[in-house]
Amino acid sequence: MLDSNLAPDARAARRILLASMVGTTIEFYDFYIYATAAVLVFPRLFFPKGDPAIATLQSLATFALAFVARPIGAAIFGHFGDRIGRKTTLVTALMTMGISTICIGLLPTYASAGVFAALLLALCRIGQGIGLGGEWGGAVLLATENAPAGKHGWYGMFPQLGAPLGLVISIGAFLLISNQLTEAQLFSWGWRVPFLASTVLVAVGLYIRLQLVETPAFKRSIAQGERVRLPFNVVFGKFPLRLFLGTLGSTTTFVVFYLANIFALGWGTNSLGFPRQQFLIMQMLAALFFGLMIPVAGALADRIGGRAMLIIATLLIIAFGFAFRPLFSTHDIAAVFVFLACGFGLSGLSYGPLGSALATLFPTPVRYTGTSLTFNFAGILGASLAAPIATYLATHYGLAFVGYYLSTAGFITLIALIFIKGEEK
């Protein structure tokens, strides 16, 4: 279980929670602008002309590369986070993500560099994945290891707020340039602006994080001589079942979010015929439910427990799977918005307590590594595969099967969460 800390003073607490939230906001902004561009822009700019569906799948494949890279980032940054400290590691992770994102904004396209452009895009995407792989676990520990007793769920949800904030800002960035630029300007140079704008955001994030001090739990662990030589080996050697169950217990959180985000954007604009700007506005408004449900879930987690909150959210997600065909099969604005709001809202309900719940699975000397690996392995299973699988199922078998896919993932997560109870103790 997490160590109990004395409550930090109000000013220090605000600084800690702001740093954990701002950092993840920037990281997820960088991550999501790629996701949006992978559906709307990159198929035309970085891949050969031909079948638009094939180009979109190729673009989504580069999107999925980051999820493969994220466990690598988790292992690298987790190692140093558990050995030299949370603060320095978080600063480095933010810089890795920021540099990779800025480089995407400077890349040549297929028209000028051919297949080399797609390879460079993939390389930058891997860099994004490595950076985010090291970011999330450290941000969660920055918050939870500073939390007073009985407040781990509340503190742990602050870095989670970075996901909806980053999503809304990224969608807003693409909406802004779409409204201000012609289609020719957007595909010529306008798409680069959201990536290059990350320079300012990263500078702000670095300034805030450099003001931090190390967490009390890490200081105690080092003072007691608990530093381990290879945290990665300890996690796999001593806690493989916790890693396995934690991964499966987190997977559906990713599946439901990326179905409501990436899959829905592609299907809504390409198959249902919604204009790009209209659908982005609907997603941005629906994403507010994502942000609203995170603090609700965090507060409830402190009352009933993080695992119990995750079980409730998972049961609701399983039920939501059966609403795919009724709500998302026609050009009905009201039905589609309800679908998006439910999808994003349930994402927040499960995502809010996830950080504090996963942090309880591992002791302080390997907590950064264990928590990061668990989260990012779940990303591979849930996020990287969700949009391609859903696109294939919807195209060949219909939307109902996309819902069945979500419900099946939810059932597997539910079983894992039931068994996690024994491991948590």
Residue ranges and their predicted role:
Residues 35-36, 240-289, 383:
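Extracytoplasmic gate region of multi-pass secondary transporters
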Residues 83-95, 303-314:
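Cytoplasmic membrane-interface "Motif A"-like loop-to-helix N-cap segments
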Residues 95-113, 315-330:
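C-terminal ends and interior cores of transmembrane alpha-helices
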Residues 154-178, 375-386:
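Glycine-rich segments within core transmembrane alpha-helices of 12-TM secondary carriers
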Residues 307-353:
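C-terminal transmembrane helical hairpin of 12-TM major facilitator-type secondary transporters
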Residues 365-394:
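A late C-terminal transmembrane helix in Major Facilitator Superfamily
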